């Protein structure tokens, strides 16, 4: 066991995977010599050399396209895009080739690649440096989308993603890269993709979140516990495919449902989760489901970020309102 940060857990997972499997290559803008803009891959080029860990030009299309080609031809690429808001030049290759290759070739080719994306806000950076774009990935058939909220989950989910035969988008909540430490096993282990985690048991309502927002929800729940409100918290872990079973079992127990995310409200993942609950657990609901999201705006400048993303006090207010709701 070692007590490490989420960032260190990701680095450890990549390091151990590369040591075990020589087909794994790591690359991206500054991902080699500098270890990435957040230093997630620091030390890997020195250990494994410039052939397996290398820098790329500022060309996201080339990064994603190269990863697809490598994966088809027997390598296991781990490609990094500096921020998820930079993905757009590479989106065509991700959707039309990475996500569809298995179906297009009727299983003759698979694309075992991982696309790492620092995700969401929290660093007071402008626009495309702070976006939460999970809707762009979760709606694409053929892509798996995961995001950790703890160092333990970061290592286990990333190792599962690396060993998956199909493309996985790995969203890294950058606001908690170094926000806290946790005991993480030194050995390799996997957390199944597509399986959510019940973070806290509760009886009055179910609240689902993922990534860095799980921590904000935990803080909010502490604010309302003294008022006698019992909240069950679920960390989604995998945005696609959704673990419907865990969520539905919880909602059938609590009777109320809420989703908290920093992603936009319109056409976002919160809407998808609420629709799923309405379709499959409607008669168990004691009140209309609630979503607390980011606003439908471009991510604001640094001074406005606090108001744009869900904060514990505001989440607590939504919880109190839902707790009082009656059929």
Curated annotation (Swiss-Prot):
<dbReference type="GO" id="GO:0004739">
    <property type="term" value="F:pyruvate dehydrogenase (acetyl-transferring) activity"/>
</dbReference>
<dbReference type="Pfam" id="PF02779">
    <property type="entry name" value="Transket_pyr"/>
</dbReference>
<dbReference type="InterPro" id="IPR005475">
    <property type="entry name" value="Transketolase-like_Pyr-bd"/>
</dbReference>
<feature type="binding site">
    <location>
        <position position="60"/>
    </location>
    <ligand>
        <name>thiamine diphosphate</name>
    </ligand>
</feature>
<dbReference type="InterPro" id="IPR033248">
    <property type="entry name" value="Transketolase_C"/>
</dbReference>
<comment type="subunit">
    <text>Heterodimer of an alpha and a beta chain.</text>
</comment>
<keyword id="KW-0786">Thiamine pyrophosphate</keyword>
<protein>
    <recommendedName>
        <fullName>Pyruvate dehydrogenase E1 component subunit beta</fullName>
        <ecNumber>1.2.4.1</ecNumber>
    </recommendedName>
</protein>
<keyword id="KW-0670">Pyruvate</keyword>
<keyword id="KW-0560">Oxidoreductase</keyword>
<comment type="function">
    <text>The pyruvate dehydrogenase complex catalyzes the overall conversion of pyruvate to acetyl-CoA and CO(2). It contains multiple copies of three enzymatic components: pyruvate dehydrogenase (E1), dihydrolipoamide acetyltransferase (E2) and lipoamide dehydrogenase (E3).</text>
</comment>
<dbReference type="Pfam" id="PF02780">
    <property type="entry name" value="Transketolase_C"/>
</dbReference>
<dbReference type="InterPro" id="IPR009014">
    <property type="entry name" value="Transketo_C/PFOR_II"/>
</dbReference>
<dbReference type="InterPro" id="IPR029061">
    <property type="entry name" value="THDP-binding"/>
</dbReference>
């Amino acid at each position: 066991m070692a007590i490490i940060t989420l960032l260190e857990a990701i680095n450890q997972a990549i390091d151990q995977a590369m040591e075990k499997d020589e087909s794994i290559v790591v690359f991206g803008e500054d991902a080699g010599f500098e270890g990435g803009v957040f230093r997630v891959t620091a030390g890997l080029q020195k250990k494994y050399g410039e052939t397996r860990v290398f820098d790329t030009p500022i060309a996201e299309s080339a990064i994603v396209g190269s990863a697809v080609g490598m994966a088809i031809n027997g390598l296991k690429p781990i490609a990094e895009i500096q921020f998820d808001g930079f993905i757009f030049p590479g989106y065509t290759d991700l959707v039309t080739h990475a996500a569809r290759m298995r179906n297009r070739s009727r299983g003759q080719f698979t694309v075992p690649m991982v696309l790492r994306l620092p995700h969401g806000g929290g660093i007071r950076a402008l626009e495309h440096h702070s976006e939460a774009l999970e809707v762009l990935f979760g709606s694409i058939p053929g892509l798996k989308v995961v995001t950790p909220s703890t160092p333990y989950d970061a290592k286990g989910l990333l190792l599962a993603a690396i060993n998956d035969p199909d493309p996985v988008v790995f969203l890294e909540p950058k606001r908690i890269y170094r926000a806290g430490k946790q005991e993480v096993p030194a050995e390799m282990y996997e957390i199944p993709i597509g399986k959510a985690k019940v973070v806290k048991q509760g009886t009055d309502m179910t609240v689902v979140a993922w990534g860095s927002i799980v921590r904000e929800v935990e803080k909010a729940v502490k604010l309302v516990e003294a008022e006698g409100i019992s909240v069950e918290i679920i960390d989604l872990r995998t945005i696609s495919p959704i673990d419907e079973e865990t969520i539905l079992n919880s909602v059938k127990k609590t009777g109320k449902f809420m989703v908290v995310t920093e992603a936009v409200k319109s056409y976002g993942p919160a809407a998808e989760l609420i629709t799923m609950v309405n379709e499959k657990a409607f008669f168990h609901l004691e009140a209309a489901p609630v979503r607390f999201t980011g606003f439908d705006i471009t991510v604001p400048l640094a001074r406005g970020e606090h108001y744009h993303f869900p904060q514990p006090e505001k989440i607590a207010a939504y919880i109190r309102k839902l707790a009082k709701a009656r059929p």
